[in-house]
Amino acid sequence: MSNSSSSSFVIVGFEYKGDVKQFRDIVFENFDVSEKYQKEIDKYVNDEYESYSAYYELCSILEKNGIDSIRDDKILIGKKLVDMDSDDSYVPDSEHDIDQLVQTVRDIRSKLNIETPIKIYTGTEQC
């Protein structure tokens, strides 16, 4: 549950200790997202933060900025299972294929050539 200035999340993913721009470049080089999201990418080409939305369908990126539960030296990368904003008073119904989630996260992790464990992260981020 969140208050008026925060959003709660549940994400299946892993910790990444690298630069978000570097991660974004790896995603565009290794996954077929550029064509699908090119219009969105072009729209936000000068706004680095907004351009992340172009590939959020593939993965979610959570940085320290505004998230108390994330240390300064890490980024969480994975798939969001729940993302509640201040207008939500309950957790929305959803169903997830665990095998598919884990495989997607493994694919992303493999492209980054890192071996950090896949975990479930929960927390609250500022809106």
Predicted region positions:
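Low-complexity, serine/threonine/proline-enriched polar segments
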Residues: I26-S89
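Short, extreme N-terminal segment that most often corresponds to the first beta-strand
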Residues: M1-E29, K119-C127
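Short, flexible/disordered intra-domain loops and linkers
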Residues: Y90-E95
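Arginine residue identity/basic-tract feature
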Residues: K17, R24, R71, R106-R109
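Alpha-helix boundary/N-cap detector
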Residues: G18, Q22, D32-K36, Y49, ...
